[in-house]
A protein has these predicted regions:
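Conserved active-site alpha-helix within GNAT-family acetyltransferase domains
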Residues: 93, 109, 117-135, 140
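Conserved acetyl-CoA-binding loop-helix of GNAT-fold acetyltransferases
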Residues: 79-82, 88-101, 124, 128
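Conserved acetyl-CoA binding element of GNAT-fold acetyltransferases
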Residues: 71-84, 136-139
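A short helix-loop-beta-strand connector motif used in the catalytic cores of GNAT acetyltransferases and
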Residues: 36-49, 76
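Conserved GNAT-fold acetyl-CoA-binding loop/helix
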Residues: 13-36
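Conserved GNAT acetyl-CoA-binding A-motif
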Residues: 96, 103-114
Length: 142
Protein backbone atom coordinates (compact mmCIF):
# COMPACT_ATOMS: atom_id res chain seq x y z
CA UNK A 1 0.00 0.00 0.00
CA UNK A 2 1.56 3.27 -1.12
CA UNK A 3 -0.04 5.23 1.73
CA UNK A 4 1.81 3.24 4.38
CA UNK A 5 5.08 3.52 2.47
CA UNK A 6 4.56 7.28 2.11
CA UNK A 7 4.00 7.51 5.87
CA UNK A 8 7.33 5.75 6.50
CA UNK A 9 9.47 7.82 4.10
CA UNK A 10 9.69 10.98 6.25
CA UNK A 11 11.76 8.94 8.73
CA UNK A 12 14.55 9.16 6.12
CA UNK A 13 15.05 12.72 7.35
CA UNK A 14 15.88 11.97 10.98
CA UNK A 15 18.42 14.79 11.08
CA UNK A 16 18.41 18.59 10.97
CA UNK A 17 18.04 19.87 7.42
CA UNK A 18 19.45 23.23 6.31
CA UNK A 19 17.09 26.19 6.69
CA UNK A 20 16.82 26.63 2.91
CA UNK A 21 15.70 23.02 2.42
CA UNK A 22 12.32 21.39 2.84
CA UNK A 23 12.60 17.98 4.51
CA UNK A 24 10.00 16.60 2.08
CA UNK A 25 12.45 17.24 -0.77
CA UNK A 26 14.65 14.50 0.68
CA UNK A 27 12.08 11.77 0.07
CA UNK A 28 9.34 12.89 -2.33
CA UNK A 29 11.21 11.79 -5.49
CA UNK A 30 11.65 8.37 -3.87
CA UNK A 31 7.90 8.18 -3.37
CA UNK A 32 7.47 9.00 -7.06
CA UNK A 33 9.71 6.00 -7.89
CA UNK A 34 7.59 3.74 -5.67
CA UNK A 35 4.51 4.90 -7.57
CA UNK A 36 6.17 4.08 -10.91
CA UNK A 37 7.14 0.61 -9.69
CA UNK A 38 3.56 -0.07 -8.56
CA UNK A 39 2.22 1.21 -11.90
CA UNK A 40 4.71 -0.98 -13.75
CA UNK A 41 6.28 1.96 -15.59
CA UNK A 42 9.68 1.65 -13.86
CA UNK A 43 11.57 -1.50 -14.80
CA UNK A 44 15.14 -0.52 -13.82
CA UNK A 45 14.91 -1.43 -10.17
CA UNK A 46 12.94 -3.05 -7.39
CA UNK A 47 11.28 -2.26 -4.09
CA UNK A 48 11.10 -4.46 -1.02
CA UNK A 49 8.66 -4.02 1.85
CA UNK A 50 8.81 -5.71 5.26
CA UNK A 51 5.29 -6.01 6.59
CA UNK A 52 3.92 -7.78 9.67
CA UNK A 53 0.21 -7.86 10.51
CA UNK A 54 -0.53 -5.18 7.91
CA UNK A 55 2.06 -2.83 9.42
CA UNK A 56 4.97 -1.72 7.22
CA UNK A 57 8.12 -2.00 9.33
CA UNK A 58 10.69 -1.19 6.65
CA UNK A 59 11.19 -0.65 2.96
CA UNK A 60 14.03 -0.40 0.46
CA UNK A 61 14.23 0.77 -3.13
CA UNK A 62 17.09 -0.11 -5.49
CA UNK A 63 17.71 1.05 -9.04
CA UNK A 64 20.05 -0.41 -11.63
CA UNK A 65 22.44 1.95 -13.43
CA UNK A 66 25.96 2.03 -14.78
CA UNK A 67 28.64 2.83 -12.21
CA UNK A 68 29.65 6.48 -12.58
CA UNK A 69 33.41 5.93 -13.05
CA UNK A 70 33.88 2.45 -14.50
CA UNK A 71 30.63 2.19 -16.43
CA UNK A 72 30.17 -1.35 -15.07
CA UNK A 73 26.66 -2.58 -14.27
CA UNK A 74 25.80 -1.27 -10.83
CA UNK A 75 22.95 -0.75 -8.41
CA UNK A 76 22.02 2.25 -6.32
CA UNK A 77 20.24 2.10 -2.97
CA UNK A 78 17.67 4.86 -3.35
CA UNK A 79 15.91 4.21 -0.04
CA UNK A 80 16.25 2.10 3.04
CA UNK A 81 14.11 3.12 5.98
CA UNK A 82 12.97 1.30 9.11
CA UNK A 83 10.19 2.46 11.41
CA UNK A 84 11.87 3.93 14.54
CA UNK A 85 10.22 1.32 16.79
CA UNK A 86 12.35 -1.32 15.03
CA UNK A 87 15.70 0.49 15.04
CA UNK A 88 18.46 -1.63 16.52
CA UNK A 89 16.75 -4.94 15.72
CA UNK A 90 18.95 -5.86 12.76
CA UNK A 91 16.08 -5.31 10.35
CA UNK A 92 17.92 -2.67 8.29
CA UNK A 93 21.03 -4.83 8.01
CA UNK A 94 19.00 -7.86 6.93
CA UNK A 95 17.00 -5.82 4.43
CA UNK A 96 20.16 -4.30 2.97
CA UNK A 97 21.71 -7.77 2.63
CA UNK A 98 18.65 -8.95 0.68
CA UNK A 99 18.93 -5.86 -1.55
CA UNK A 100 22.63 -6.52 -2.18
CA UNK A 101 22.00 -10.17 -3.05
CA UNK A 102 19.14 -9.34 -5.38
CA UNK A 103 21.20 -6.60 -7.06
CA UNK A 104 24.10 -9.01 -7.54
CA UNK A 105 21.71 -11.57 -9.04
CA UNK A 106 20.55 -8.79 -11.38
CA UNK A 107 24.11 -8.32 -12.65
CA UNK A 108 25.31 -5.43 -10.49
CA UNK A 109 29.02 -5.35 -9.68
CA UNK A 110 28.56 -2.92 -6.79
CA UNK A 111 25.98 -0.92 -4.88
CA UNK A 112 26.19 2.81 -4.31
CA UNK A 113 24.12 5.07 -2.08
CA UNK A 114 23.88 8.64 -0.89
CA UNK A 115 23.91 9.66 2.75
CA UNK A 116 23.46 13.22 3.92
CA UNK A 117 26.64 14.38 5.67
CA UNK A 118 24.78 15.31 8.87
CA UNK A 119 23.11 11.91 9.03
CA UNK A 120 25.85 10.38 11.15
CA UNK A 121 23.67 7.45 12.21
CA UNK A 122 23.19 6.33 8.60
CA UNK A 123 26.81 6.95 7.67
CA UNK A 124 28.00 4.87 10.62
CA UNK A 125 25.60 2.07 9.65
CA UNK A 126 26.87 1.97 6.06
CA UNK A 127 30.53 2.15 7.07
CA UNK A 128 30.00 -0.73 9.51
CA UNK A 129 28.78 -2.75 6.51
CA UNK A 130 31.92 -1.92 4.47
CA UNK A 131 30.54 0.92 2.38
CA UNK A 132 33.18 3.59 1.84
CA UNK A 133 32.73 7.26 1.03
CA UNK A 134 33.99 8.33 -2.37
CA UNK A 135 32.50 11.73 -3.21
CA UNK A 136 31.61 14.84 -1.30
CA UNK A 137 29.01 17.09 -2.91
CA UNK A 138 29.16 20.84 -2.36
CA UNK A 139 26.24 23.22 -2.77
CA UNK A 140 25.84 26.99 -2.65
CA UNK A 141 22.55 28.88 -2.58
CA UNK A 142 22.57 31.62 -5.21
Amino acid sequence: DLKTIKALLPYLVAFTVPEDRDSEDFWMSDYDLYQKIVEGSYKDGFALVVEVSNQVLATALVSFRDEILSGNPSSHLEVIVVHPEYHGTGLAQNLLEVCENRAKEGGAHCMTLHAYHKNTRARSFYEKLNYCGEFLRYRKVL
